[in-house]
Swiss-Prot record:
Family under the similarity heading: Belongs to the reaction center PufL/M/PsbA/D family.
Transmembrane regions listed in the UniProt entry: 33-56, 85-113, 116-141, 171-200, 226-252
Positions that bind a ubiquinone: 217
Keywords: Bacteriochlorophyll, Cell inner membrane, Cell membrane, Chlorophyll, Chromophore, Electron transport, Herbicide resistance, Iron, Magnesium, Membrane, Metal-binding, Photosynthesis, Reaction center, Transmembrane, Transmembrane helix, Transport
Source organism superkingdom: Bacteria
Protein known as: Reaction center protein L chain
Binding site for Fe cation: 191, 231
The UniProt record lists the keyword ATP-binding: no
Gene Ontology annotations of biological process type: photosynthetic electron transport in photosystem II; response to herbicide
UniProt xrefs under CDD domains: Photo-RC_L (cd09290)
Annotated (7R,8Z)-bacteriochlorophyll b binding sites: 154, 174
Length: 279
């Protein structure tokens, strides 16, 4: 891929966290760096292990291939390779690849003199994954509480965990996570729609300005957060969705073992309701 006209001046030495100048180069448009190498290593190794694990299983059906975590009897120990050990190695590879990618983003930010909003945002996605496969299993005492790597098996795990707590939608942190996910979609779709509508006026008319965009929302809802503000809001909403999704699963089991509908008993016990006792 040809280098764009403005790219050359940004391809400068330095900004690396590890390795100095050894891996400080580009392949086409892609910056490599030490963490680019480790990302590639962990990604290739993890993918190869998944394919090898599938070859040892009963099917090549893409929907049914599954790499399961160890049985609960192994606790937090190292399991035999074909009894969950493969899942443990793949998990290490996944974390290694994700963290390496985030650190590679940090190096790119350092080269460009930018702040670290992008790698910080990606780190929240890493947090959600690590919560599922490391933090929660450790708190519950067994790697077997992690989710399997497979399409249908993963969906079965989600369903089973939900039913373990009777009705997972009553989990307050889950409510917050879903609210932030939906609100992110709403905010970003409205923002995207606004930009496209301003950038695509009727034939023969000039492109509209940020004043038009601000005025639209002032007319529509009485307030405009502004061009920079909508991106701050979008980042906050998206990070909140990832954060509360991690919270909702990590409190289920380690800190709350009953059905989530029972958690709302405090609401019924508020003094305000005492004049209407339950019968």
């Amino acid at each position: 891929m040809a280098m764009l006209s403005f790219e050359k001046k940004y391809r400068v030495r330095g900004g690396t966290l590890v390795g100095g100048d050894l891996f400080d180069f580009w392949v086409g448009p892609f910056y490599v760096g030490f963490f680019g190498v480790t990302t590639l290593f962990f990604s290739v190794l993890g993918t190869a292990l998944i394919i090898w694990g599938a070859s040892q299983g009963p099917t090549w059906n893409l929907w049914q291939i599954s790499i399961a975590p160890p049985d609960l009897k192994y606790g937090l120990g190292v399991a035999p390779l074909m009894e969950g050990g493969l899942w443990q190695i793949i998990t290490v590879c996944a974390i290694g690849a994700f963290v390496s990618w985030a650190l590679r983003e940090v190096e790119i930010c350092r080269k460009l003199g930018m702040q670290y909003h992008v790698p910080i945002a990606f780190s929240f996605a890493i947090l959600a994954y690590v919560t599922l496969v490391v933090i929660r299993p450790i708190l519950m005492g067994a790697w077997g509480h992690g989710f399997p790597y497979g399409i249908f098996s993963h969906l079965d795990w989600v369903s089973n965990v939900g039913y373990q707590y009777l009705h997972f939608h009553y989990n307050p942190a889950h409510m917050l996570a879903i609210t932030f996910f939906f609100t992110t979609t709403l905010a970003m779709s409205m923002h995207g729609g606004l930009i496209l509508s301003a950038a695509n006026p009727k034939k023969g008319e000039p492109m509209k300005t940020t004043d038009h965009e601000d005025t639209f929302f002032r007319d529509a809802v009485g307030y405009s957060i502004g061009s920079l503000g909508i991106h701050r809001l979008g980042l906050f909403l998206a990070l909140s969705a990832a954060f509360w999704s991690a919270v909702c699963i990590v409190i289920s089991g380690p800190f709350w073992t009953r059905g989530w509908p029972e958690w709302w008993g405090w609401w019924l016990n508020l003094p305000i309701w005492s004049q209407w006792p339950l019968k």
